[in-house]
Amino acid sequence: MAEPITIRPMLAADAGPVLAIYQAGLDAGDASFETQAPSWTAFDTAKLPAHRLAAVADDTGDLLGWVAVSPVSSRCVYAGVVEHSVYVDAAARGRGVGAALLQALIESTEAAGVWTIESGIFPENTASLRLHERAGFRVVGIRERLGSQHGRWRDVVLLERRSTVAGLS
């Protein structure tokens, strides 16, 4: 059963928990090629402010997860295309937090005219692949041996969600 949560804009005051959840995801090994969470300044600079959202437990106020986007390119033709990251605290997984974050992200990006949300996910991260499929993402390809992590070449599944309301004209 999903616990009562609130999805709200990410705040600078969330930096500690956001980066801790990020680092825990990186430490688990199937979230990213990165091994170290960035500084808050680097995170804040890279992510679009209008689409940085946090999931907070209604009863405790604890930050349970977050989602944020970055532009995929500075070229104007890609103005409506973003790449997202979604991370959920290990203790909150399986409770609907990731689904709520993705739904809120879809709503915020569509309201801003974003027509495509992309993500690259390791094929071993089956929970994330299922989460994205349920949120309307589809696999558009597999980037084979995209990069090396800890001496092992890894594939990345490229997913996208095309808006049904933004970018249609």
What is each model feature region?
Residues G94-E107, R130-R134:
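Conserved acetyl-CoA-binding loop-helix of GNAT-fold acetyltransferases
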Residues A28, S32-A91, L102-Q103, S108, ...:
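Acetyl-CoA-dependent GNAT
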Residues G80, R145-S169:
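C-terminal "cap" of GNAT-fold acetyltransferases
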Residues H84, I117-S119, L159:
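A structural signal for short, well-ordered beta-strand segments
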Residues T109-I121:
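Conserved GNAT acetyl-CoA-binding A-motif
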Residues A68-P71, C76, E118-I121, E133, ...:
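Conserved catalytic-core motifs of GNAT/GCN5-like acyltransferases
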Residues R93, S119-L129:
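Conserved beta-strand-loop-alpha-helix junction that forms the acyl-donor binding cleft
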Residues I5-V18:
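A short beta-loop-alpha structural element at the N-terminal edge
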